[in-house]
Structures are given as structure tokens and as C-alpha cells.
Amino acid sequence: MKKLIVIFFLLPLFVQAQLSTKSAGTDLEALAKNIVNQCADIQENEIVFINGDTRDIELLEDIAVNVRKNGAFPLLTVSSDRLTRKMFTEVPEKYDTQLSILNMEVVKMMTTQISVTSGDTPGLLADIPPERFVARNKAQKPVNDLYRESSIKSVQLGNGLYPTKNRAAQFEMPVDQLSKMFWDAINMDYNKLTTIGEKLSKNLTSGNTLKIVHDNGTNLSVKIADCTPYISDGKVSADKPGGAGRFVYLPAGEVFFAPVAGTANGTLVLDQFLFRGKTIKGLKLVFEDGKLTSMEAKSDIETLKDYYDAQDDLLAEFSFVDFGINPKITVPEGSKLYTYIPAGTITLGIGNNFFANGDNNSNASMDFHLAGSTVTVDNTAVIEKGKLIY
């Protein structure tokens, strides 16, 4: 769940796949310089929190050195699958509700956070009761609220595509193909992303109703009048505290916003939905007046329902829309590549929409990727059968 900006300095709850960047043949020093200078725009005397997986230690060190070369101060922490799991299996459950004093103090101190996606085991925490996630998210809420009101910049490398054997297997594509796609997207011309994003944003702000249809049975509409789209183009924008423009997701290439609350109606169908390491087939979600009213699937969804039922009521609210605009990311024929940024993909979400400057303050969020749809603003198509029009 990339979009819920939850600060787990020692323990990322929602784990994504990870590959050593060194094995991908990447110029780590050049990448570190770009992240520090272009994406995060690190200035003298900043305090920069850097975190990632132990297998990416060389990249993390290069980032830290480049931060210091700018006269700023790096604080580096690392994690691993082993640590993530043991923090649940060996730490007593009674501490799930404990406010992290350390996290509060770090948020007060830092000016920028740079994260490299960590984790390498799908379903690593699949056997952990959902109530434990709920308890930890609630305990984390004061930290998140403080983070939201701050002016902390954030750069995250991964964005659901970090190339690994596990993730490539999940997408049913060769890891070399996924790796090339990932790094091509990282290295694309970000000015082009800005141009594409601005054109799409103009179309969105000129209309009143967004409608999404798909041959799989999806037929959903939501009001978007007076909404403010944000462009994720790989650069931190000059923004006020709490502004969505201070978040950078790499590879970049998204336009996202919070729609009008209480206006989503219709059905969203996902041919496949990956949840906690398991694939749910034919997931059908029904929305009425902005709230999720039912979910069913062709395969077992008890794990998903148990997780959903354990959350607060705000998770039921349809709360964000995210368009993929990166033309360097294409969905290969026959693959199951589902993520935010391929041009022509649309992601719809429920629950916390902090990342889009929304008002939903749920302790959780869920997002659903849909490729191959047709999307219109009033009567003007912005996506036609999965192809972004720009």
C-alpha cells in the first residue's frame, strides 16, 4: 500500500519485493546523486532520514554520502524480512498499542525522508492476525498526523515495480524484462512526464463526472468537480506544509486526486487482486453514494474480508483516483503486471487519502489497479481501451 504514507522507521508493515540494485547493473553513484540533488533537492543543514533493505546497503551508503556532500546530515537505518517478521512473532502483542516515542522525535527532527523499497517475501506476514495491523496503525496515527502537518519531503524508490524474481514471478514475466522496464522508467525524461500530466490534469479539471468502464463488468462513476490533481513527475514541488507535491515516487508518472466524497456509484471488477501473497480472482466491489457496500469474488476472499472488517469505518469510503502516465511502462501481453504508473492504467482507492491532500483519515487504505479500461470525463475520453490519450 504505497499511498498510505505510514512512517515505520524500523518496521514497514506493508512489504514489497526487493532486489539488490547492484545486481541490476545500475550506476549506484549516479542514481544516488540524482535522488539527492534532483528528486529531493537536499540543501545545507537538512536532516535526512534514509531507510531501506540490507541488500541495498551500497546504494543507501551512496545516498548518505551525497547528502553529507551537500552539507546536510544523514540518518541511515536498514531493515530485512527477518527483522520485519520477528518484530511480529517475537515482540509481545501488548506493545502493538504503544506509541513510538522514537518515531515522534524523528518526525520532529527530519526535513526529508528517502526510502528504498524493502522486503522480498510475498505473504511474509500473511499469517499475522489483522487485528495486530489495526492496533499498530492506530498507535502510529499520532506520528502520521504530525508527519502530515509537517513540510517533510519524501522520495520513495520502488513504486510497486522494484525488480526481483519474486515480483517478476507475480507479474508472470522474466526478471530481466521487469528490470529493464524499471530502470528505463527511472531514467526517462521527467519533463515529458510533466507535459503529459499537465494535459491530463487540464482535462480532469474541466469536467464534472469521471466514468470508468471495462469489458470485465466494471461500470463506475464519481464526481470530480473542483478537485485538484497532483502530478508525480519525479520532482519535489515548492508546496506548503502538508502539500501532496512534496512526495516523490520513483519510477514517476502519475496524476492523482481525491474525488468528491460520497459520489462514487457503480461496480469495480478486478480479474485478479493480490492480497497478502494470495491471488483473488474475479473480485467485485460495489459502491453506493461513495461507500463500499459489498465485495465478492470467484475465489476465496475470507482473508481479505477479515482484514477489511477489522478496520475503521472510514476504510469503506471511495477516496482516491490515480492515473498512470509513464509511457516507458507497458503491460506485456499475457503478463499480470498491476501497478500505478503504466500509461493507461487507473488505480482506484478506498480509505486514507492523505497522499492526495484528501480528508479521509482512516488508519488504513486499499488500492485497486485496473488496466484496459475506458475512462471519460463527462463525454471526453482520457483513456480508450487501456490507452492513455495525450
Predicted regions and their residues:
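Intrinsically disordered terminal and processing segments
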Residues: 347-390
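Dual-mode signal for accessory low-complexity, basic/Gly-rich regions
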Residues: 265, 278, 294-359, 375
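Active-site bordering "gate/hinge" segments
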Residues: 17-265
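Short, glycine-/Ser/Thr-/acidic-enriched flexible segments
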Residues: 55-56, 119-121, 164, 217, ...
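Short, solvent-exposed amphipathic alpha-helical segments in soluble enzyme
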Residues: 64-69, 227-229, 238-239, 284-286, ...
